[in-house]
Design a protein with these regions (language model features):
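C-terminal structural segments of small proteins and small subunits
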Residues: 90-95, 100-107
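Alpha-helix boundary/capping residues
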Residues: 12-13, 52, 97, 106
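Sec-dependent N-terminal signal peptides
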Residues: 5-14
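A periodicity- and composition-biased signal for non-globular, repetitive helical segments
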Residues: 8-9, 35, 105
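Conserved short beta-strand edge segments in small beta-sheet-based binding/regulatory domains
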Residues: 61, 103-118
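Short S/T/G/P-rich N-terminal loop/turn motif that feeds into the first structured element of a domain
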Residues: 13-78, 85-92, 118-123
Length: 123
């Protein structure tokens, strides 16, 4: 009986260490849906969407996609999705000068409304 308890404790410790190691390498998917202040189809709208794609040049950004909403199920017109190899990579992106400048100079001024959500992705 004591042997079984000991083996159970050892397996629990190994599992916890494995889980903790995985949490340090968990991928992150950052998603935002948004509505612009610009008229649909305008040059300003197109310029904003081009500017978003430049965020892909920031170190750590993977799989950046900017998508157009096709249904009337909500008030948002566009979606943005990108992935990061880790929480650390995502944190570095958030504080990167190019991202901060984009948010201050474009996002705050040109986005009417948005919803942001971040997911852990299974490894």
């Amino acid at each position: 009986m004591k042997r079984n308890i000991f083996i159970g404790l050892i397996l629990s410790v190994i599992f916890c260490q494995f889980t903790m190691a995985q949490s340090n390498t968990t991928r992150i998917r950052h998603m935002v849906v948004f509505k612009l202040k610009h008229p649909k189809g305008s040059a300003e709208e197109k310029d904003f969407l081009i500017a978003i794609k430049k965020l892909a040049a920031i170190p750590g950004v993977e799989k950046l996609e900017c998508m157009k909403q096709v249904s009337k199920k909500n008030k948002f017109d566009y979606g943005l999705s990108m992935e990061f190899a880790s929480q650390q990579a995502y944190d570095q992106y958030n504080s990167h000068p190019d991202h901060v400048a984009f948010v201050q100079n474009r996002w705050v001024k040109e986005v009417e409304d948005f919803l942001e959500i971040d997911f852990e992705l299974p490894i």
